Design a protein with these regions (language model features):
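Conserved short strand/loop->alpha-helix "switch" segment adjacent to the catalytic nucleotide/phosphoryl-transfer site
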Residues: 35-54, 125
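Short adenine-binding "F-helix/F-box" segment of the Bergerat
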Residues: 96-97, 104
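A short glycine-centered beta->alpha linker in the GHKL/HATPase_c
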Residues: 90-95
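GHKL-family ATPase ATP-binding module
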Residues: 2-22, 30, 54, 62-64, ...
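C-terminal interaction appendages of subunits in large macromolecular complexes
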Residues: 414-433, 448-453, 464, 468-470, ...
Length: 664
C-alpha cells in the first residue's frame, strides 16, 4: 500500500488544540511500568512472561553472590502461579528513612529502590540487578504478588495487587532464628500478557541451569506442580505419579557448563580437559572455560554478574582480540607459522570452539534493563590481559594440546583462503555476464527492496507453476533442484562452489559470513517453499541451517519465512476449500460430508492459480516467520539435526516429537 500523506487546508484544525502544561503527564509509582511494560521486560509476549521469573531469581542469585544463599527453589503452581524461595538473609523489613515505609515495601513499590547502589557500602558488592527495578517491575506486571520474609526469628508477609499494597506488612508468626530467606509468589496479569500466561518448563529449566553452572555449588530446584506425570523407570516400568522436578547443582561451575554444552551436541573434542582461565583486579573478576571440537562452528556464551549478555560487550571483545593474538604469537615463536604465512584470523582460531565467559563487577554497566550487552571498558583490559598471559602459559605447559588446536585453526585458515579464491572467481564470472543474477531466477519488477519478496522453491516443476501464478510486480521466484549441501558438515569454501546455494547467495545480494551486509538485501521477505512431506521438511531444514550459519541477521531481523502449502483439497460441487493440517481436514469433513478429498503430495500437483491462491497470495496464505528467541538453543538444534551423530538426532526427535510435524 502506498504511503498516504494527509494535509489540512483548515487553519482551525492546526490551532484548535493548544499544547500547554496540562498536556504533560507525570506517571506515579509503578504506572510507567504498567503503561509501557516492554521498556522494562522486553515484551508482553512469552519472552517477557518468563523474564518476570528471571528478575526474582536474579535477586536470589545476588544473595548467593554475596555468600548468603545456597539453595533456590522455583515452583510453577496450578494456574501458572510462580513461587521463588531462597535461603538468603531475607529482604529487610525495618523502616527505610527516606520513605517512612518498611524496606520490603519500598523494594516492591518504588522503581530504582534496592540494596545495590552503594558500592563498597551497599548490601551487595556484586549484583546483576543493578537498576533496582526488578522486584517492583514484577509486582507491577502481576495480578497479585505476595512476599514472605523470614529474618530475626519472625515471618513477615505483604500482598500487592497490580503494584499497589493490599494492606500493610504484617508479622504472621515466629520461626527458628536460623531460618532466613525470602519467598515471592506471583500471578502474571492477564490484562498485560494477552497472548499467554502459560509458562514453558523447558525455557525455565534452561535459564536456571545456566544460573547453576555460573554459581558453583548453589543448588537450584525447579518443580512443575501444574499436573502430575508418570515417569518411566530404567527397567521400562512406570513409576509413581509425581511432579516433574529438576535439581541442578554443579561444583565444577563453568567448566561443567562447557562439558555439558559439548556433550549435548555429542561433539568430538580435540582435548579431553576443559581449559580454565581466571583473573582478578580490584575492579572485578573474570573466569573463562573453553574447549575445542572437530565441528566448524563457534559457540560463545557470555555473562556479567550472572546475567546472560547475548549481544556481547567489552568482555567478549577482550577475549576475542586476545585469543587471536595468543595463537599468532605462539605460532610464530614455535615455528607453527612461517614467515611467509599470513596471520590467523579471529574466525580461524574460533572454529570448533565452545567457550563460556563469566565476569563479576562491582559496578556493571549494561545497556538497557534487559541487560543484553556489557559496556564496562575496564573489563576489556582485564579479560584481554588475563587471556593472553594465562592461555599462553597453558600452551607452553601443554604443547600437545596447543598443537592439536593450532592444526585445527590452520585448516580453517586454508579453507578461508580457498573460499576467498572461490568468491573472487564467482565475482569475476558474474562481472563478465550481462546480469549478476542466477539464470533460473524470475525476478520481480519492483526495485524497492522493502516491498518485494522472493520464493525459494523446491523443484523445477513447482518453480514453473510459481512463476506463472505469482504477482510478478513484487514476487521473485528461484527454483532449487537436486541435492542440497549440508553446511553443518562443510566449510565456507564449498559453498562458493555449490550450484544450489550460490544462486541463493547471488539472488539475495547481501553476501555470507564475514562479508554479510544486510543493507544490500534485495528482498524484504525470503520464503522457503517446499513440499509438505519429509523431503520438503529436510530441504527446509537445510536452507534454515544455511541461513543460521552464514546469514544469521536475516533470521534475527525477521526476513525469513516458511510458506505453508495446503495438505488437502476438499471439493463438493463447485465449492473448493483447502486444509493445511489434519485438524482442519477433520473439520472440513464434518462441514462438507461426501466431499471429494485430494491429498497433495507435492507443490507440482497444484496449477499456478491454486498455488497462488493457497500459498502465495498475501491476502490468503499461511506462513511461518522464523525467529531466534535463543541462539544457543538454536545452535544445539542445528548441530544435532544436521550433524554426523545418529543417536543424539534420534533422541532429539523423540523428545521434541510433540512439537514436530511428522509424515510417516
Amino acid at each position: 500500500m502506498a504511503e498516504e500523506i494527509i494535509t489540512s487546508t483548515n487553519a482551525e484544525t492546526a490551532t484548535d488544540h493548544e499544547y500547554n502544561a496540562s498536556e504533560i503527564q507525570v506517571l506515579k509509582g509503578l504506572e510507567a511500568v504498567r503503561k509501557r511494560p516492554g521498556m522494562y521486560i522486553g515484551s508482553t509476549g512469552e519472552r517477557g512472561l518468563h523474564h518476570l521469573v528471571y528478575e526474582i531469581v536474579d535477586n536470589a542469585i545476588d544473595e548467593a553472590l554475596a555468600g548468603y544463599c545456597d539453595h533456590i527453589e522455583v515452583k510453577v503452581l496450578k494456574g501458572d502461579i510462580i513461587q521463588v524461595t531462597d535461603n538468603g538473609r531475607g529482604i529487610p523489613v525495618d523502616i527505610q528513612a527516606d520513605t517512612g515505609l518498611p524496606a520490603v515495601t519500598v523494594v516492591y513499590t518504588i522503581l530504582h529502590a534496592g540494596g545495590k547502589f552503594g558500592g563498597e557500602n551497599s548490601g551487595y558488592k556484586v549484583a546483576g540487578g543493578l537498576h533496582g527495578v526488578g522486584a517492583s517491575v514484577v509486582n507491577a506486571c502481576s495480578e497479585w504478588l505476595t512476599v514472605n520474609v523470614r529474618r530475626d526469628g519472625r515471618e513477615y508477609e505483604q500482598t500487592f495487587r497490580r503494584g499497589d499494597p493490599d494492606g500493610p506488612l504484617k508479622c504472621i508468626g515466629t520461626v527458628d532464628p536460623s531460618v532466613t530467606g525470602t519467598r515471592v509468589t506471583f500471578k502474571p496479569d492477564p490484562e498485560m500478557f494477552k497472548d499467554t500466561t502459560v509458562y514453558n518448563f523447558e525455557t525455565l529449566e534452561k535459564r536456571l541451569r545456566e544460573e547453576s553452572f555460573l554459581n558453583a555449588g548453589v543448588k537450584i530446584t525447579l518443580t512443575d506442580e501444574r499436573e502430575l506425570y508418570t515417569p518411566v523407570l530404567e527397567d521400562g516400568k512406570e513409576g509413581e505419579p509425581t511432579y516433574r522436578t529438576e535439581v541442578m547443582c554443579y561444583e565444577g561451575g563453568i567448566k561443567s557448563f562447557v562439558t555439558y554444552l559439548g556433550e549435548k551436541r555429542d561433539l568430538e573434542v580435540l582435548h579431553p580437559n576443559v581449559i580454565y582461565l581466571k583473573g582478578q583486579t580490584d575492579r572485578g573478576m573474570a573466569e573463562i572455560a573453553l574447549q575445542y571440537n572437530s565441528s566448524y562452528n563457534e559457540l560463545l556464551l557470555s555473562f556479567a554478574n550472572n546475567v546472560n549478555t547475548p549481544d556481547g560487550g567489552t568482555h567478549e571483545e577482550g577475549f576475542r582480540s586476545s585469543l587471536t593474538r595468543v595463537f599468532n604469537d605462539y605460532g610464530r615463536s614455535h615455528g607453527l607459522l612461517k614467515d611467509k604465512d599470513e596471520n590467523l584470523s579471529g574466525a580461524d582460531v574460533r572454529e570448533g570452539l565452545i567457550c563460556v565467559i563469566s565476569v563479576k563487577l562491582q559496578e556493571a554497566e549494561f545497556e538497557g534493563q534487559t541487560k543484553a550487552k556489557l559496556g564496562n571498558t575496564e573489563i576489556r583490559t582485564l579479560v584481554s590481559n588475563m587471556v593472553y598471559s594465562k592461555l599462553m602459559e597453558f600452551f607452553e605447559e601443554n604443547p600437545g594440546v596447543a598443537k592439536a588446536i593450532f592444526e585445527k585453526a590452520t585448516q580453517a585458515a586454508r579453507a578461508r583462503a580457498a573460499a576467498k579464491k572461490a568468491r573472487e572467481l564467482v565475482r569475476r564470472k558474474s562481472a563478465l555476464e550481462t546480469s549478476r543474477m542466477p539464470g533460473k531466477l524470475a525476478d520481480c519488477r519492483e526495485k524497492d527492496p522493502t516491498r518485494t519478496e522472493i520464493f525459494i522453491v523446491e523443484g523445477d516443476s513447482a518453480g514453473g507453476s510459481a512463476k506463472m501464478g505469482r504477482d510478478s510486480a513484487i514476487q521473485a521466484i528461484l527454483p532449487l533442484w537436486g541435492k542440497m549441501l549440508n553446511v553443518e558438515k562443510a566449510r565456507a569454501d564449498r559453498i562458493y562452489g555449490n550450484d544450489k546455494l550460490m544462486p541463493v547467495v547471488l539472488a539475495l545480494g547481501c553476501g555470507i559470513g564475514d562479508e554479510f551486509d544486510i543493507s544490500k538485501l534485495r528482498y524484504d521477505k525470503v520464503f522457503i517453499m517446499a513440499d509438505a512431506d519429509v523431503d520438503g521438511s529436510h530441504i527446509c531444514t537445510l536452507m534454515l541451517t544455511f541461513f543460521f550459519r552464514y546469514m544469521r541477521p536475516l533470521i534475527e531481523q525477521g526476513h525469513v519465512y516458511v510458506a505453508q502449502p495446503p495438505l488437502f483439497k476438499v471439493q463438493k460441487g463447485s465449492t473448493i476449500k483447502y486444509a493445511y493440517n489434519d485438524a482442519e481436514m477433520a473439520l472440513l469433513s464434518q462441514e462438507m460430508p461426501g466431499a471429494k478429498i485430494n491429498r497433495y503430495k507435492g507443490l507440482g500437483e497444484m496449477n499456478p492459480e491454486q498455488l497462488w491462491e493457497t500459498t502465495m497470495n498475501p491476502d490468503n496464505r499461511v506462513i511461518v516467520r522464523i525467529t531466534i528467541e535463543d541462539a544457543e538453543k538454536a545452535d544445539e538444534a542445528f548441530t544435532i539435526l544436521m550433524g554426523d551423530q545418529v543417536e543424539p538426532r534420534r533422541r532429539f526427535i523423540e523428545t521434541n516429537a510433540q512439537y514436530a510435524k511428522l509424515d510417516v
